[in-house]
A protein has these predicted regions:
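A short helix-loop-beta-strand connector motif used in the catalytic cores of GNAT acetyltransferases and
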Residues: 48-63, 94
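Conserved N-terminal entry element of GNAT/NAT acetyltransferase domains
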Residues: 1-17, 25
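Conserved GNAT-fold acetyl-CoA-binding loop/helix
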Residues: 27-50
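Conserved beta-strand in the GNAT
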Residues: 63, 70-79, 94, 99
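Conserved GNAT acetyl-CoA-binding A-motif
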Residues: 122-132
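Conserved acetyl-CoA binding element of GNAT-fold acetyltransferases
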Residues: 88-102, 154-157
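Conserved acetyl-CoA-binding loop-helix of GNAT-fold acetyltransferases
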Residues: 97-100, 106-119, 146
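Conserved active-site alpha-helix within GNAT-family acetyltransferase domains
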Residues: 111, 115, 123, 135-153, ...
Length: 160
């Protein structure tokens, strides 16, 4: 995919059905990694929730679209104000979800979405960007490391 054939923009209500399709794709990746946690063929967000999220001031939903207007990927991010007695106060962006259609992965779509999110975070005065990646999702871990992300903390679990 050529970079000039791709546009990254804020999501619109008309994009929701395609976003839901892509949410199903990413859920199925997670379900393969952790069938004990994820149900097959479900989505993290339903269409009404995405519609509501589009109106929130602390939520950023980006889509990458091809020349024909087909949504090839999305990025959900939330803006947070970090405060605490022992924490440096700052604004932060948390990338909640990023998905590229399986048919066009490794073609620069994810990179373009991430670059736009970084630009957006800078314009909004964020000091950092955080995200979570499921253990075993080596493609995602490699992608984020190659784009400057490094471990900040570890979440450990003990199955009972």
């Amino acid at each position: 995919m050529e970079a000039e054939e791709l546009t990254v923009r804020f999501a619109k209500e008309a994009d929701i059905p395609r976003i839901v399709e892509l949410l199903r794709q990413v859920n199925n990746v997670h379900q393969q990694l952790r069938p004990d946690l994820f149900l097959p063929d479900h989505t993290k967000y339903a269409a009404p929730e995405i519609k509501r999220m589009l109106r929130l001031h602390d939520t950023v939903i980006l889509v990458a679209v091809d020349a024909q207007g087909l949504v090839l990927g999305y990025l959900f991010a939330f803006l947070k104000q970090i405060r605490g007695d022992n924490l440096v106060s700052r604004r932060s962006m948390h990338i909640d979800d990023l998905c590229v259609d399986a048919a066009v992965r490794h073609s620069g779509v994810g990179r373009r979405l991430l670059e736009q999110a970084v630009e957006c975070a800078g314009q909004l005065g964020c000091a950092d960007i955080t995200l979570n990646v499921w253990e075993g999702n080596e493609d995602a871990i490699s992608f984020y490391r190659n784009h400057g992300f490094a471990p900040k903390s570890h979440i450990l679990e003990m199955k009972l």
